[in-house]
Amino acid sequence: MSVINFFPNQLFKRSFVVFAFIGLLASVLCACSPQLDWRTVTSNQAQYTALFPAKPEHLERNLVYQDQDILQVLDAVKIDDAIFSISTIELKKDQASLEDGILESSKNALSQQTDLVKDASVIREANYQTADHQRFAVKDYYFEVKMPNHSQFMRSRWIVRHTPAGEVFIYQVSVLLQNVKSGNVEQMLSQEQYATFFEEFHPL
């Protein structure tokens, strides 16, 4: 599994603009066969298990947030025009106070891109399950980006895990569909192959 460090620190101010982040991945990731080859992936580094439709690429970048060094890792797979990704930000015990600010920045970044995001009003209640079968509520966010000749659809959810040692893991589970000609963002990203990716993400 390769590790690619290609994100300059000056991009941090836009580091939570997920369309830009994942869009950049599209130029790095190779599209796999349309045949979905589901496999369970366990990340000891990011402390989760997930079901990916192919072997994911592993990318890392170092961020500076409020004078604190933070590692962001991303595991992602591109299948045709769909990118399945899990972003993880790990906060050490003495960085835990940054949690709310990072979450707010991450969730607000897309809606702040008013020149791109035309419809970001769909938010749905959902739930996720931890590896030890505890179930918690979560919200799913659906976004549509209008391009001149097509759209991009995105579904994201944010999950926060607090460890007994005081560390905080902030996960963003997302699917981005590129080159969408027509359709409803919520209906399309609720199809089984995308729903499975969200349902089978489990923090350890």
List where the protein language model places each region.
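Bacterial signal peptide processing site
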Residues: 33-35
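Short, well-structured beta-strand
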Residues: 73-96, 114-118, 126-204
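Post-signal peptide N-terminal segment of mature Sec-exported envelope proteins
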Residues: 40-62
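Bacterial N-terminal signal peptides that target proteins for export
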Residues: 2-21
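Short acidic, Gly/Pro-enriched loop/turn segments at secondary-structure junctions
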Residues: 62-71, 99
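C-terminal motif of bacterial Sec signal peptides marking the signal peptidase cleavage site
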Residues: 28-31
